[in-house]
Structure formats: structure tokens, C-alpha cells
Amino acid sequence: KAVAVLRGDSNVSGVVRFEQTHESEPTKIFIGQNSILALTVVVHAGTDDYGK
């Protein structure tokens, strides 16, 4: 299971896509180009690219 919590202004919209090629691979979270973030976060064992 994957869950994303995104916060932003009421006019922010977009698509979030989760991708995992294999159960042992990290989950990639793609945040659409129309979002204010416009980035991809790769989750490794409970952390993100930023080590949180």
C-alpha cells in the first residue's frame, strides 16, 4: 500500500502516480507537471529522497 499526503492552495491540482516495478524495489511517487511541486520522490524503506 502507498499513501501520499499533499497540501497546497485550493487552486492547486494535479495527478499523483505510484510506480513499483517489483515488490523489492523502491516505490516511485510521480507528482504531475501541473502540480506546484512537479517532482518525483523515490521512497526507500520508509524514507524519501530527502532522508526524512
Swiss-Prot record:
InterPro entries: SOD-like_Cu/Zn_dom_sf (IPR036423)
Function of the protein: Destroys radicals which are normally produced within the cells and which are toxic to biological systems.
Taxonomic classification: Eukaryota, Fungi, Dikarya, Ascomycota, Saccharomycotina
Localisation: Cytoplasm
Co-factor binding details: Binds 1 copper ion per subunit.
Subunit and partners: Homodimer.
Obligatory cofactor(s): Cu cation; Zn(2+)
Keywords: Antioxidant, Copper, Cytoplasm, Metal-binding, Oxidoreductase, Zinc
GO molecular function: metal ion binding; superoxide dismutase activity
Highest taxon in the source lineage: Eukaryota
Family stated for the protein in its record: Belongs to the Cu-Zn superoxide dismutase family.
Enzyme Commission number(s) from the entry: 1.15.1.1
Reactions performed catalytically: 2 superoxide + 2 H(+) = H2O2 + O2
UniProt name for this protein: Superoxide dismutase [Cu-Zn] 2
A cellular-component GO term for this protein: cytoplasm
Binding positions for Cu cation per the UniProt entry: 44
Major subcellular location class: cytoplasm
